Structure formats: C-alpha cells, structure tokens
Amino acid sequence: AFSGILAEADIAAALKACAAADTFNYKAFFAKVGLSAKSADDIKKAFFVIDQDKSGFIEEDELKLFLQVFSAGARALTDAETKAFLKAGDSDGDGAIGVDEFAVLVKA
C-alpha cells in the first residue's frame, strides 16, 4: 500500500516499536516509519492510503485500525490511543483528521 513511499524495513521497525498495547506514539511512529522526513506530496499519498473509505477524512474507526493499514497482522489501537491520536490531529474539532491536519500531525 505504501510502496514507493515507505520502506518495508522501516514499517516493520515502527510496528515492532509499538506492538504492546498503549505504547503507540504518533510522533515516534511517523519518525520511525520515515514519513515525517517525506515531501508534502508523499505525505498526502499516505493520507489517501489511510483514508480507507475515501471520504477525504481519517475518522476514529480508521484511526483505530491505523497500524493495520501498514501491515495486516498489526494490532488495532486501544480506545485510549485512538482518542489521543484523534485529539492530537483534529485541530478544528470536527471529529476527523483532514489532509492538511494530517500533514501538520506528521511533521509535529
């Protein structure tokens, strides 16, 4: 799903680092997976991969399954992780993360 954007080895390392419940940290994850160093264009491409229903927003249910977009065998985020992730990214308070909000979150 992220071929041409992210390296498989970086994805594996990032997923391994947050394999235990309640250890997910979006800043650490985006840095480890290599996304925070990418161009605005690549970050936008990643957003559209994560936006599974193609609504133009990443909603709470998509955030919960965020890690599984990177690898099917990855765990779901806990409710606490999901809510913290949404709160960090949803700067306008509409309950979802838009493409511009996502870009800010990745670079945070």
Swiss-Prot record:
CDD domains: EFh_parvalbumin_beta
Positions bound to Ca(2+) 2: D90, D92, D94, A96, E101
SUPFAM superfamilies the record matches: EF-hand
Keyword set includes Calcium: yes
Sequence positions that bind Ca(2+) 1: D51, D53, S55, F57, E59, E62
Keyword Calcium: yes
Any one GO molecular function term: calcium ion binding
Segments forming domain EF-hand: 38-73, 77-108
Function: In muscle, parvalbumin is thought to be involved in relaxation after contraction. It binds two calcium ions.
Protein name per Swiss-Prot or TrEMBL: Parvalbumin beta 2
Species: Merluccius productus
Lineage of producing organism: Eukaryota, Metazoa, Chordata, Craniata, Vertebrata
